[in-house]
């Protein structure tokens, strides 16, 4: 016998998803304010922004969409040209290939392990430890869906919508069979202020 509560919860989730989509389309600002309130339990002040997190929302809505350099640096492929231009080519992770579709990839030419990423989004990644164990059908389906996704529209981060969707395959960086410790430096007004250390990551990159 089916669980009526489960059906009710699925229905409520479907309604919530539909409402989020409608609010995003009608008023991205209203959506971001609702999202901010839900996550932080604070009202989102944008005129002017006061909290650091409010300033991030202001940039997301009103500044980044007008600055092509933000899209340039957010793109996983395009940012490589910028890094090279700035003289830091030695800091780039080696790339095995850049592709416009999954079916362009010649897996026989790739090493045993690597990382596959979409150029135009965050979180659209797949870590491959052993290509012989890959479920190519599942990967193909996943990346075809990702490449068709307008990530900027999905997340209300419009600068992502300017990035050409591609698949980039990079060398897998690992330490003793695990992902390495990641260090993120937060820079404010040109000065490094905070160090964020990420450890114990699984498949989420």
What name fits each language-model region?
Residues 41-43, 87, 190:
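Glycine-centered flexibility motif
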Residues 1-67:
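Membrane-proximal basic amphipathic "stem/tether" segments
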Residues 12, 20-21, 25-27, 32-33, ...:
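Mixed-charge, polar/low-complexity N-terminal
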Residues 110, 136-205:
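Phosphate-binding site of ATP-dependent enzymes
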Residues 14-16, 25, 30, 74, ...:
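A sequence-composition feature that detects small, non-aromatic residues
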Residues 15, 22-26, 39, 93, ...:
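Weak global preference for isoleucine
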């Amino acid at each position: 016998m089916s669980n009526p509560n489960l059906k009710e919860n699925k229905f409520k989730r479907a309604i919530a998803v539909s409402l989020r989509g409608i609010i995003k389309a009608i008023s991205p600002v209203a959506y971001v304010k609702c999202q901010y309130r839900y996550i932080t339990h604070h009202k989102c002040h944008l005129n002017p922004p006061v909290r650091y997190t409010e300033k991030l929302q202001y940039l997301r809505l009103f500044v980044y969409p007008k600055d092509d350099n933000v899209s340039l640096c957010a793109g996983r492929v395009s940012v490589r040209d910028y890094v090279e231009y700035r003289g830091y080519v030695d800091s780039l992770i080696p790339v095995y290939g850049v592709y416009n579709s999954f079916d362009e990839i010649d897996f026989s030419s790739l090493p045993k392990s690597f990382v596959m990423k979409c150029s135009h989004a965050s979180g659209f990644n797949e870590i491959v430890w052993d290509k012989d164990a890959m479920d190519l059908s599942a990967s193909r389906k996943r990346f075809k869906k990702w490449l068709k996704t307008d990530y900027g529209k999905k997340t209300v981060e419009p600068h992502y919508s300017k990035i050409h969707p591609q698949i980039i395959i990079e060398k897998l960086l690992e330490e003793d069979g695990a992902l390495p410790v990641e260090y993120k430096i937060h820079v404010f007004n040109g000065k490094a202020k905070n160090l964020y250390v990420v450890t114990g990551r699984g498949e989420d990159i």
